[in-house]
Amino acid sequence: RLGIPVLDVPWANSLADVRSITTMLGDELGAPETAKAMLAEMDREIDAARAGAPRPPVSGILYEPNGYASVGGITNEIMTMSGIVDVAPKSQLTRTGTLPVEAVVATAPELLILGGEARVGSARAYTILHHPALQALKGRTTMEFASLTPLLCPGPWSVGAAKTFGDLARKARALAPAKARH
């Protein structure tokens, strides 16, 4: 009514969605070459992630503030290409999408990625990432904090998380023989 153009941009739930939305935005905003360049960089990062991924993949859970477990969607695609198979027990997710810490401990993945800050006290949401029950995983699970900002709003930049995931997966794989000896 006011003559202001509005562009409705859908949420990307997969890398295929990222590709189509980025192309659409490039066309709509008069920057198709920029969109193509962003997608080409995304493809290079995907190729690098796949090439460096440990095989067989390590079992992992991405555990986030307030106890949310990332399951499915673009995050799962990026974890998979980086050599991590998501083993978060979907059947144990609460109706709000959180995963009880007991389920994490019972699953005992090779890799537990704690999405957020390693320091305690910056926000109440982070307290579960420091839950004493997680100490039961020491010696069995590689536990690492990781900032996963590229995943907050899906776009070509989101595959930047693949490097972090890949580095952590390779670390978990390298530490696995040492853990087996103890």
Model-derived regions, located:
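Short, solvent-exposed loop/turn elements at domain surfaces
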Residues: 67-74, 114, 121-122, 152-154
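Acidic/His-rich segments in extracytoplasmic proteins that coordinate ligands and/or metal ions
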Residues: 1-28, 98-141
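His/Asp/Glu-enriched short active-site or ligand-binding loop at hydrolase and phosphoryl-transfer sites
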Residues: 74-96, 116, 141-145
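Histidine- and/or cysteine-centered catalytic micro-motif in compact active-site loops
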Residues: 63-66, 91-92, 109, 117
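Short gly/pro-enriched beta-turn/loop segments at secondary-structure junctions
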Residues: 53-58, 72-74, 106-107
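Extracytoplasmic substrate-binding proteins
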Residues: 1-67, 88-89, 141-182
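Internal, well-ordered alpha-helical scaffold/interface segments
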Residues: 23, 40, 65, 73-80, ...
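Short secondary-structure boundary/capping segments
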Residues: 51-53, 76, 134-135
